[in-house]
Each structure stands twice: as structure tokens, then as C-alpha cells.
């Protein structure tokens, strides 16, 4: 089912048989997250938390990362990464690979600092995200999703070897920046019972869960994935980092082909498991956010709300991280009219 109890957690750890020749990632510390919070203050928005207007008795809150300057949480990690990149970044430039949001965030930060930026994006990236990347001055390199995923797993792209690669989710600077969201959630709702986080590569989940584990370990953290690509749920079920078949959908910001082993090692001790939602549930959440709260969220951003509404993350105080709002207006119109694809 993609969940773990405390006993199941022990079993999963003992059963995991991950390959030894893989990248390793040191756990992020609360000090790194707090330093990132100070470092990016003034560069990013401290986003509000509002209650979801719903007819249910559930107490659901929305952490509105869609209000960030580039429309997603990625600007936090990108700001932290650029600040820590070193003096050579000016001459070498930076690049990343992204479905759109990371590329926008890095391009925006690079532009603020006079740094050249390139973005490797999948050839089916939403036009809204492509326009924003261009507006921020980055060079776009469109390739197949498989080629993007190859850059994700190898951390390199031959034609850009002279530039500094900033990984979209397994870079410690990115994860620490993401963790600042967890600090803010606990500052605003200290008695929160659970937090639901969209899971793409794991950097957002790892950062937020680390902050919450350190500051309020009784609060539970859940990931959410779409049914069209749920490698984390498969990994929890099997006890090791798994690769799954990925079906493209309007939920383009989350749902990869696999969980990188280094991210699996980091995330699995920190969260309860992954809630898998159908495209219909996520589309309904997109509509609900618009109709009840006047909030525009992309599929990935609305997935956390869809997961919370299932009740699987608990029925007390639940905070949903609305990770982004970069959705094509045409696609939003289709979803609002009841079309799901």
C-alpha cells in the first residue's frame, strides 16, 4: 500500500538490498536548514498558510508555495544553491534538468545575479513553463524524458560540462532550502498533526521531513504520488529503491521513473509512506482549490490536497504543501470543465 508502521519500518530496512556502487548523500542537518532560512530571507517569499474551505469536518491547511516569484517552491533551493556556488559560478554559469519549475527557479536566480543559465527540459514540458524559462533568460535544451532522466541519474550532460550542474532534488543545497518550508509550517501551526508533500525526486520531501523530524518528531509526514508514476510507493512495498513504468499526464511536476537510491536512503526513515492518488482525485483537487479558495495549483501542487482528502494522512490538523501553480491556462480550463488526461 505504500505505508509503513514502526514495525514495518524495521522490516523494510532489513529487507532493503540496494546496490553498493551508488552515490551517497549525507543527511541534511537542522543547522543547514536554519542557515538556508537566513541566507534566502529577502530573496523568496515567506508563503502564507490558509485553511482549505471544504464541506468536510477535516481541518486541512494549505502552504501556498504557488505564490513564490517563479510559481513554485523550487526558488528556495535555487536561491540557497546559487548563494553557495562559489565565485567561479560567474564565469562558468549553471545548468539543471527539470520538468519546468526548477528551470524557472534557477533561471530567475541566475538572472538576479548576472549568471548564465541553461535548462534541459523534456520535450513535453508545458508551454507556460517554457515561456517563463525564456522570460528569465535561460537557454532551453529540449530532449526526451528518458534523456532528462539520464541527466538526473548521472549528474552530467556532455555539451554543458564546463558549467556547474545544480541537481533539481539531490543537491544538499536544494534540500536545505526546501527544508525552510518545514520550519515555517511549525512556526505557523505548531500543533500540526501531519504534513503531506508532493514527491517527484524527493528533495522537497527530504527537506521538509528533516525539519519536522528535528523540531516536532510526533508530526507525521506523508508523500503523495500520482497513479501514473509512483516509484516511492513501490519502493516502500519492496523495501528498496524501485523503477516503475511512467505514464505521462497533466501531473507533470511529480512522478518520476524511479527513486534514486541516495534519495531512498534519505527519505525512508523520515516519512510514513506514499499516498497514491488517481488523476481524477488530483483533478478534483485542482477544481476545489479554484472554486473554494481561489487558488490556482498545478497537478503536482494539488496532489497534496487530493491525498489529504482521502483521510489517509489523518483527520486532524493536516498541512498540504501546494508546491506550485505553473499550469497552462488551456489545461486548467480543461480540468475545470471536467476533462482529465
How would you label these PLM feature ranges?
Residues 3, 13-341:
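PLP-dependent amino-acid enzyme catalytic core
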Amino acid at each position: 500500500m505504500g505505508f509503513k508502521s514502526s514495525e514495518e519500518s524495521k522490516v523494510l530496512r532489513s529487507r532493503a538490498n540496494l546496490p553498493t556502487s551508488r552515490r551517497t548523500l549525507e543527511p541534511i542537518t537542522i543547522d543547514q536548514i536554519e542557515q538556508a532560512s537566513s541566507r534566502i530571507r529577502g530573496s523568496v517569499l515567506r508563503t502564507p498558510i490558509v485553511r482549505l474551505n471544504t464541506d468536510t469536518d477535516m481541518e486541512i491547511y494549505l502552504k501556498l508555495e504557488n505564490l513564490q516569484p517563479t510559481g513554485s517552491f523550487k526558488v528556495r533551493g535555487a536561491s540557497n544553491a546559487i548563494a553557495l556556488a562559489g565565485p567561479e559560478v560567474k564565469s562558468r554559469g549553471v545548468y539543471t534538468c527539470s520538468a519546468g519549475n526548477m528551470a524557472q527557479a534557477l533561471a530567475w536566480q541566475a538572472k538576479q545575479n548576472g549568471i548564465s543559465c541553461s535548462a534541459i527540459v523534456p520535450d513535453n514540458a508545458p508551454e507556460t513553463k517554457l515561456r517563463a524559462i525564456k522570460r528569465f533568460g535561460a537557454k532551453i535544451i529540449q530532449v526526451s524524458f528518458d534523456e532528462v532522466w539520464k541527466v538526473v541519474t548521472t549528474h552530467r550532460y556532455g555539451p554543458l560540462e564546463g558549467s556547474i550542474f545544480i541537481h533539481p532534488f539531490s543537491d544538499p543545497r536544494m534540500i536545505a532550502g526546501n527544508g525552510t518550508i518545514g520550519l515555517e509550517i511549525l512556526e505557523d501551526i505548531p500543533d500540526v498533526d501531519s504534513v503531506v508533500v508532493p514527491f517527484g525526486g524527493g528533495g522537497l520531501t527530504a527537506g521538509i521531513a528533516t525539519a519536522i523530524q528535528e523540531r516536532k518528531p510526533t508530526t507525521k509526514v506523508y508523500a503523495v504520488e500520482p497513479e501514473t508514476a509512483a516509484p516511492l510507493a513501490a519502493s516502500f512495498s519492496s523495501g528498496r529503491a524501485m523503477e516503475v513504468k511512467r505514464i505521462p499526464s497533466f501531473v507533470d511536476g511529480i512522478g518520476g521513473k524511479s527513486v534514486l537510491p541516495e534519495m531512498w536512503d534519505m527519505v525512508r526513515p523520515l516519512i510514513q509512506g506514499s499516498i497514491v492518488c488517481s488523476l481524477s482525485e488530483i483533478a478534483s483537487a485542482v477544481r476545489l482549490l479554484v472554486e473554494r479558495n481561489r487558488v490556482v495549483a498545478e497537478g503536482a501542487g494539488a496532489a497534496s490536497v487530493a491525498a489529504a482528502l482521502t483521510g489517509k494522512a489523518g483527520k486532524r490538523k493536516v498541512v498540504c504543501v501546494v508546491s506550485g501553480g505553473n499550469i497552462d491556462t488551456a489545461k486548467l480550463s480543461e480540468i475545470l470543465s471536467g476533462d482529465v488526461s
